[in-house]
């Protein structure tokens, strides 16, 4: 199992898009992504400049998306 990498919000959003998610809308500094096959799933990614997404938030986003750390590394 791979440790969670340090990743910026922009890179995380691109990785989630490669996994099939799309940006539904942006509210302030938060991007809301949805998946066409799973309409009940809504993922919010904080995008505050070039800062990396904190590990706890990244772990929660991966859990919501149904991805593992290894899958995220492949999508980056």
What are these regions (language model features)?
Residues 50-76:
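C-terminal structural segments of small proteins and small subunits
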């Amino acid at each position: 199992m791979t440790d969670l990498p340090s990743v910026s919000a922009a890179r995380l959003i691109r990785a989630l898009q490669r996994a099939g998610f799309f940006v539904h809308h942006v509210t302030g500094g938060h991007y809301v992504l949805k998946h066409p096959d799973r309409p009940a799933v809504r993922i919010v990614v904080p995008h505050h400049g070039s800062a990396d997404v904190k590990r706890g938030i990244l772990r929660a986003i991966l859990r919501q998306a149904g991805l593992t750390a290894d899958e995220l590394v492949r999508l980056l």
